[in-house]
UniProtKB/Swiss-Prot annotation:
Motif range (Nuclear localization signal): 301-304
Record's protein name: Transcription factor p65
Domains as described in the record: The transcriptional activation domain 3/TA3 does not participate in the direct transcriptional activity of RELA but is involved in the control by RELA of the accessibility of target gene promoters. Mediates interaction with ZBTB7A.
Gene: Rela
Record GO terms (molecular function): actinin binding; ankyrin repeat binding; chromatin binding; chromatin DNA binding; DNA binding; DNA-binding transcription activator activity, RNA polymerase II-specific; DNA-binding transcription factor activity; DNA-binding transcription factor activity, RNA polymerase II-specific
Phosphoserine modified-residue sites: 276, 281, 311, 467, 527, 534
Species this chain originates from: Mus musculus (Mouse)
Motif 9aaTAD: chain residues: 534-542
Highest classification ranks of the organism: Eukaryota, Metazoa, Chordata, Craniata, Vertebrata
Amino acid sequence: MDDLFPLIFPSEPAQASGPYVEIIEQPKQRGMRFRYKCEGRSAGSIPGERSTDTTKTHPTIKINGYTGPGTVRISLVTKDPPHRPHPHELVGKDCRDGYYEADLCPDRSIHSFQNLGIQCVKKRDLEQAISQRIQTNNNPFHVPIEEQRGDYDLNAVRLCFQVTVRDPAGRPLLLTPVLSHPIFDNRAPNTAELKICRVNRNSGSCLGGDEIFLLCDKVQKEDIEVYFTGPGWEARGSFSQADVHRQVAIVFRTPPYADPSLQAPVRVSMQLRRPSDRELSEPMEFQYLPDTDDRHRIEEKRKRTYETFKSIMKKSPFNGPTEPRPPTRRIAVPTRNSTSVPKPAPQPYTFPASLSTINFDEFSPMLLPSGQISNQALALAPSSAPVLAQTMVPSSAMVPLAQPPAPAPVLTPGPPQSLSAPVPKSTQAGEGTLSEALLHLQFDADEDLGALLGNSTDPGVFTDLASVDNSEFQQLLNQGVSMSHSTAEPMLMEYPEAITRLVTGSQRPPDPAPTPLGTSGLPNGLSGDEDFSSIADMDFSALLSQISS
């Protein structure tokens, strides 16, 4: 009630007809923090009650009925009467011994004080501060010394303005002291400014019971309540002291609205209220909604989302005119579809069929006399060795082929095929080409093989096969086979060169030029000039046994 007395009963001047002091800008009661001396920083400036973030005001007084020289003293006194000198002190420009004193401008009647700060003292320095007030005669209301001992409210002070002017005779005239509204320290929860910082929701059912989380500045859990007010209605949120978390958060449930059968939303005010001094925070809007089955407010969220989507689409730069646009003109441009000839796929290196792929059943119609062939001749046709790809040149004794030969087959590396059983005709392309060619040949049993190979019997050119070392020749063949398996491509010229070197008995000559296709020779690597008595002397059974081994 003491805070309301200056508003209801304003202080009257001591002399109605004489000068008096009036406070036209009160100091701001809350929001300022009292600073300790040990903090080593300025205590700030006391703002005016109408001060904002953009417009700063300060405590201001007006001396009515007087213009001229004078002095003013501003000191701190207690909030409650008797107004004793307060142990806190004013600091700033023109401040000493805990109070402010300066001369007034004689040309003005309104005076503002911008550089006033409040510095608080510790409880252990309380007695020393009171003794200093008594020694400096800082006692505006002349409170006896015995009454100055006792408890002090260190979280609230008042400003006391004492103005001294000159009377017509030039003597000092002390005007009646004037007190300001209380100023509270913002550090103390019981006197700090109440402020709602944030809530998780600002609407609820008219039946109440909705849980709300509220964040605020420091409050005292035993001296705080959530206050709802509306037109002709007021209520309080329900919570316990345990629902106040660290003085900065409150979890409460909303009270039911006065009209439970609400049909339209109603807006009310929600505030923090301190019962001890009836201090209220700035109001925050809260909306009571009609009770429906939609407890989770799905329809409300859907409508809000729809409205947001509509507003976005209206502002969208891609939202063009609704008139149908003319069709886009299209120009026919001829295109040339060039059919690219596909490149031929790389073909693997081909080899003619070896003796292992010949179907010897085809030789049954042929009448060949029995004979023996030397072991050296049998070694000329190994089953696993590749054969030189060479075109056979028909001689005068050969009959032309009835049909062109098939393409040479691809040599597939692998183990030699067993010839213990009859070898069937191969179905692959190119297999059995040599056998088909031999099938269409007609031999005379009395015809000399040398005539077929070139009719050359010069001993200086050819050497008898009996002089060939079979073991050395077999070793060379084995080396050729291993080389053909280890390398990517078979060495086709390995066997003819080795045979020539062994037959002639000379060292390996330098690589000769490629042999022309017209050169006489056999596909198994024998030179066409080698002399056999007759092809009928060849024992094919011995040849087959040698191939199978």
